């Protein structure tokens, strides 16, 4: 009985170690319609400029201030200002001095955001663009699980064999 459990555990170990590599190969070999798809920004015949449609540029909207083709696909929106921010660095544990902050209360981890400073509506004579002024904010995050998912299966099988 122990021998059969050991064989099953060994087979699970082999499958767990090979599964991520096999999955990544399959993802790179996707063919068919997916290769023929294009984003609207990449296709000249489908792309339309705001002037052609008649869209008025809104300088208060952070997404209309710049060319949409240049905007990163991975945006993070700051819940306080509503502006599009860029992620800076990795998810890190909150220091004890910041444990009471809203972004640290949820998970105990934080990630730095580089956000544009919102324009003060009372200051009409502001000479700089709001996107030129940046400020650092934080958002709650959870640390990335760096362990491979197959390792948990192997650990489970080994515990079953040993018990």
From Swiss-Prot:
Keyword field: Host cell membrane, Host membrane, Membrane, Secreted, Signal, Virulence
Positions of transmembrane segments: none
Residues spanning the signal sequence: 1-23
Keyword Signal: yes
One cellular component (GO) term of this entry: membrane
Keyword Mitochondrion: no
Places the protein is found: Secreted; Host cell membrane
Segments carrying motif RxLR-dEER: 37-52
Coiled-coil residue windows: none
Biological role stated in the UniProt entry: Effector that enhances P.infestans colonization of Nicotiana benthamiana leaves.
UniProt comment concerning the protein's domains: The RxLR-dEER motif acts to carry the protein into the host cell cytoplasm through binding to cell surface phosphatidylinositol-3-phosphate.
Full protein name: RxLR effector protein PITG_13625
Highest classification ranks of the organism: Eukaryota, Sar, Stramenopiles, Oomycota, Peronosporales
